[in-house]
């Protein structure tokens, strides 16, 4: 295993430098959140229906958790440098090759766009995030919050930038250019990434008065041990059920408002406010996990999602729906900062990325189930009421799973093992 077979002078490594490199990598990886701007231009170029191209994007989201799982496995075997470079190459190749797919073979998009981009981005995301978090056992929430804020917030400027390049040239040029730029930047940053040593304690760290040790000072559980614990299955349940409101709304933000007769300009504003809430929630609530613990912050996320659901179900004004979008952005967005802390707290930092990837399989299943149930209920009832009631139940089931996760008593490591 990489973490036990290499030697590293910890004092020669600036953990803030690792953080900055990781944030830049995650910023580039965040382009996956802006891929909706490619749907209409690609549909026009290939002569497909927009819904068919959107299905290519949905398939990409199915491969993404698998890439994340693989990224966590590669991180523990080969370290942060190797995994981020591998992810950058695969992810960049997906964008570049999508830009080269001829109009006579649009089916190749399922390989270049769905498979390569999805897998490569998942590898990059998980590898960079958990590599960074390994260096901040004393500030897990802040590190996760920064990573998620940069990753989620990048679409705020990447989406309009990609749209501008597409309008000025064409979508093929945009994809090709983005692939080269993202790959080069991520590879250069990846060259400076290093995994933290076992039992790593930051220089100058002062232990709390109660004598509690950092999670890195206890034995880390591999997935072969983790999956036998109730902590793993409760986390999988939390990650599967909690995002219900998001999975209902993520492809319907604009449609929901226009269906209510609200002007499209407000619908666009709603998406922007959702993104702002998402970034703020990831950063601020992520930081709060260091002070309050992940369970209390997770309950705050649930409360925000409940407020969102009530506003969506009963709201008749533009202001109420816009507020619902902000609450959903903050509530769901912050869970992306909570889950990494949940994994490292229960199982330690060494295998947390791999465990996180396995727990994402529950979410992956729900990305296929909930949107289909939503579409069927909307078609049969003509409204969202049934779908929202389902979301209230599932989201509540998710938070129950999260807050019921008991502390896992792991053996304390007596000696520092460096990498």
PLM regions with names:
Residues 106-123, 320-333:
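Hydrophobic core of transmembrane alpha-helices in multi-pass small-molecule transporters
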Residues 245, 266, 272-278, 282-342:
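C-terminal transmembrane helical hairpin of 12-TM major facilitator-type secondary transporters
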Residues 151-198:
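Helix-loop-helix hairpin linking two adjacent transmembrane segments in secondary transporters
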Residues 42-43, 74-75, 160-170, 257-258, ...:
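Interfacial helix-cap and linker-helix signal at transmembrane-aqueous boundaries
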Residues 35-39, 224-285, 370:
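Extracytoplasmic gate region of multi-pass secondary transporters
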Residues 67-80, 282-293, 378:
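Helix-to-loop junctions at the C-terminal end of transmembrane segments
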Residues 42, 123-136, 143-144, 334-347:
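Intracellular juxtamembrane helix-capping segments at the cytosolic ends
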Residues 89-103, 304-316:
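C-terminal ends and interior cores of transmembrane alpha-helices
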